[in-house]
């Protein structure tokens, strides 16, 4: 897993953006991940974040998609607050600001889901991704009233709530349905699995706090009648159902699975053989590793663009002070002599495992520090290797 440090730090344009986790990633995974909530008090600095920052995130969101919402008791119809127009032959969409402002004054919550290409949001999300070893998706919530955006519900993903402006009261209840999947929304199951009556937690999340909530835990974040803005970073691992679906897609390779069905007595023997084939495939280590390789290979990490270094033919190497990290959420395969980053599988010899291992254990390590750790290596070749792996989007620069 990446990011074993208690404090993960990222810098851009001289502004420090960091999340201070009060547990290591290994302890978090063992004691908290998918098990119980965890509150990180004063985990982020909010000095560099303002309503101007929040406005810019909303302005750059695609308001026409279903990922952008305005909620007041229910999700409002798009036509109520978005207009379409032709801009020199291009269909565009924009917020009808007077209407949006009016809804916000009445207590509505503005929601932007699946945020991409926002540097500050991306840096927080990347730290959480490295801390958990999982894919992440980021959302933003802005409100000014005292009404909740949704009634008490559970999420089908683990979430890190990062409070950046103002406060929110969180009322949290233990799960009534354990580990719900994305098809098992609380609104469809609340009668069968009702919310407990006694809260597990009732607290105020303040600016700078980060709150981790596992999937399935009932919660109701309540605005307190004051301006509030928070990010929600959801984490997405491979689930057992994903593996089962993958296994079933392999079954047509077996002749028994391709047979037609007749009466029960005629089909029973063949179905028993199918069950044996399925069990053998499902429990084979080779199947599991192949699935995980495919899952990780399909994952993409948005690395920072560095045209002035990798696009300039006169630049032969990344700067010595540049920070280096792996373009992956997890160091999957490293102990077996390979890593997968942005769809590229990189086979490693013993020295390569040590090199990538150093980067994995210390994301953001400088090129100069890497060179110093391998005094017997050919410095010129090492610099060239690191530069080429950055150019191939296997590694990326973090601070240069």
Predicted segments with their positions:
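Acidic, low-complexity/disordered tracts enriched in E/D and polar residues
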Residues: 281-360, 383, 387, 398-400
